[in-house]
Amino acid sequence: MATMDLSSDLVEEILSRVPARSLVRLRSTCKQWEALIAEPRFVNKHLSHMRYREQQFTVFNNEHIVSPLFGSTTSYVGIDFNKPENCGVKLPFPIALSPAINISHCDGLLLYVTKSMLLVANPLLSQKRWIKCSEGFDHSMDAYGLGYLFNQSSGFYDYKVVRFRCGIKNSSRVEVYAFKSDSWKVVVDTNFGGFDGLPLSSVCLRGTPYWLGYNKSGNELMSIQSFDFSKERFEPLFLPPQSIGSRNLVKYISLGIFRGDQLSLLLECHETCKLHLWVMKKQHWSRLMTVDVPQDAIYGKYFSSFIERNGRLALLIKSRNISIYIGGENQEFKRFEYFTGLGPMLSDCCYIQSLLQIPGFSR
């Protein structure tokens, strides 16, 4: 049977909707595909599709599998709502030297904070790049964000890292690292008050990092802060009404990304023991869902949450093991258990696989 030649535009459109993991396997089968898949323009187009469709992972560091020989091993838990009973995916990604104290994510790139250095990695492409920390580095009190700004002259994104000091007794020193120049610089932002401790949660949306934490002012109120890399300054974001209060009113609260392009907030009230999911739409918070906390999950820790297209909420909860709860407003949560007997988790974040090359990476 004769084969049909497809136009290059149609081939590109088809490949841009293929999961990243499959494209990595396919790129060696055709030189033209390999060249296309490596193009920054195609990578950005593919990522824009995958933000809505790609399988999401929660990345966490397991303290029990840290060894002097192999360093720290990072594990991944995959979520597949179509087959939740088989959604546990454990993919080790060895990291040399000390274990990661904190992990954050931006478009398929992971930023690991260790006791002495920073590591940026794309596990799917087996790429990593170490970043030397500037003077005064303190992993116990420094918060980080990975993001980017669009470079008008080159037509590409310039990836950067922002770092700021937390703590009531510390000045809110802010520094920005540029991959392009491989250097840090101090940024002065007199309007940024800072957090009284490390942020409770952080995410990156369209290149802008966001953090949720308690204000340094001493009033025990929470706030959301974002960092604009183009203006090199922090910008506050107001919270939903139910989350404005002291530490005693909110039992749990966390930032998330809803369907790839909207900021979300999950909180549990102390009094009602109900979970409320809020989504930011056009600079206004809208409550999307309210559910009862699963009874056997009351004493666990929520790692991350996100919504699948049919309106189900997924909770990853850590107690003595990792459990996944899937449910909605009018349905009971179903529990799926994974990875029993794990040790303490040092850090975690949500992660989407991508074909994005680490800036400045060389083998």
Curated annotation (Swiss-Prot):
This is Putative F-box/LRR-repeat/kelch-repeat protein At1g11620. Pfam families: F-box, FBA_1. Residues 1-50 form the F-box domain. The keyword Repeat applies. InterPro entries: F-box-assoc_dom_typ1, F-box-assoc_interact_dom, F-box-like_dom_sf, F-box_dom, SCF_F-box_component. It comes from the Eukaryota. Signal peptide: none annotated. Keywords: Kelch repeat, Leucine-rich repeat, Repeat. The lineage of its organism: Eukaryota, Viridiplantae, Streptophyta, Embryophyta, Tracheophyta. Kelch repeats lie at residues 158-207, 209-254. LRR repeats lie at residues 221-246.
